[in-house]
Amino acid sequence: MATRGGGPGPGFRHRALRGLLLLCLWLPGSRPGEPAAPSSGVDRLLQDFRRQLQRARPREELEPELLGGPREDCPGAGGTAVYRAVPDTIIRTQDSIAAGASFLRAPGSVRGWRQCVTACCSEPSCSVAVVQLPRGPSVPAPMPAPRCYLFNCTARGRSVCKFAPLRGYRTYTLSRAEDAAGIPPRPDEDKPPVSKAGKDVVLHLPTDGVVLDGRESSDDHAIVLYEWTLQQGDPSSVDMKVPQPGTLRLSRLKEGAYIFQLTVTDSVGQRSSDNVSVTVLPRPYSTGGCSSACSRYHFFCDSGCCIDIALACDGVRQCPDGSDEDFCQNLALDRKLVTHTVATSAQPGAMGLNEGEGDPKLEKSQRATTHNQPATVSHPETRIHSTQKAPESQINPVQPDSNSSGKNQEEGNYDLKSKSGQAGGEHPAPEAGAVLPLALGLAITVLLLLMVTCRLRLVKQKLKKARPITSEESDYLINGMYL
């Protein structure tokens, strides 16, 4: 493609330099014993291209061919394979194996880097040899043998190994003629990436935020782009930031449900998406010690939990639904209604009986007055007068007639019973829990008394049977023996 000035564009020059680099892989390298040939224009062009790439990309991302030295023929390969040495470089084992590379073996009988390269050249699938050099010249003689590691970095027709700079190691990359002449992989061999947005998250307010991590996404080659988008939720209720590729930090979250989508793109443009939900719940209600383990010493809330019975009716709502205080208000209202009903239905003679216990004549006069009063006495007056004590000088005893004395006496007894029953209604009946132990104790006591009585009777009978023989009985028996 040409630029506006008519000259070749940067893309054209980049493709041309790449073609020249592949062409140079076919050129035989100089022998170790031969003098170096004068550099040609192509070599100078390749060196300039190598320097430009080194300035544009960090060292750990460069291919070993661009960082290495001159190419040399593999020993015993007949010119079909060449190797290049890359000093101070080591293979990134985990990343390389994850990308498709494989570890072959570690020869233990090598005495130098040449034997390690020879072992790799003799291995048909070996493409990278890593040599661990001895630690500096300060090591006393004899020098220890270096360690050698062989890898197969070719997968799907391309090199997939990753490298990193590290002193004390040297990497040797092999290029074979059949690899250079191989057919590039077809697009259908490149599998699409697998997107993993992580597990769903549930938060409670207040919260500082959460970090979504999608770096578990994978691809058979490489993922070049991570994209996070909000699919559901109010965008103004959350702040989204990307601290590093593959992650998303959420802050200032408000109550609600959010759905985020992670889309990953591989090196050939294939995409994959995955969703993750973030649920933000409101601040949990403080139950004030409301527990699910309840006993008879607890107050049962309407919501199902319970609190200490001493905390009920203290003016503070410990139950989540406030039933501990509502119950007390209803209980106080019921007590007022019961007291009002009893006081309203009471007759004037009730207070006269309680207040005039010391005077029998007063009791009779009150009973007679009660039965002789008309039925049209108003309740307010009854309630007012029942709370006041009349002086004895104002009370006139009334003697009942002889004909109606028995009837009045029976009615008076009935009134006493009914009034005593009404007075007893104001006090709560004893609980069943107290009556049951009392009845059980009485039954056990009676049973023990019966057992003791039976035991005493048996003992008395045995004593009667075992009483000693009198002198008269003994004489009778002796005389009977001689007769």
Swiss-Prot record:
Alphabetized UniProt keyword annotations? Disulfide bond, Endocytosis, Glycoprotein, Membrane, Phosphoprotein, Receptor, Signal, Transmembrane, Transmembrane helix
Q: Which residues belong to the signal peptide in this entry?
A: 1-32
Q: Where is the composition biased (Polar residues)?
A: 367-376, 385-407
What positions are modified (Phosphoserine)?
A: 474
Domain annotation MANSC: ranges: 85-172
Q: Where in the cell is it found?
A: Membrane
Membrane-spanning intervals of the chain: 434-456
Q: Name one GO cellular component term.
A: membrane
Cite the record's Basic and acidic residues compositional bias ranges: 408-418
Extracellular side of the membrane: what ranges?
Answer: 33-433
Q: Indicate the segments forming the LDL-receptor class A domain, all copies.
A: 293-329
- Positions annotated as glycosylated: 152, 275, 403
The domain of life for this entry's organism is Eukaryota
The cysteines joined by S-S bonds are 294-306, 301-319, 313-328
**Positions of the region Disordered?**
346-428
Q: Which residues lie on this side of the membrane: Cytoplasmic?
A: 457-483
One of its GO biological process terms is:
multicellular organismal response to stress
Membrane association type: Single-pass type I membrane protein
Entries under InterPro entries matching the protein:
Ig-like_fold, LDL_receptor-like_sf, LDLR_class-A_CS, LDrepeatLR_classA_rpt, MANSC_dom, MANSC_N, PKD_dom_sf
Gene3D superfamilies recorded: Immunoglobulins (2.60.40.10), Low-density Lipoprotein Receptor (4.10.400.10)
Where does the protein principally reside? membrane
Q: Which residues form the PKD domain?
A: 193-287
PANTHER family associated with the record: LOW-DENSITY LIPOPROTEIN RECEPTOR-RELATED PROTEIN 11
Q: Which family does it belong to?
A: Belongs to the LDLR family.
Its protein name is Low-density lipoprotein receptor-related protein 11
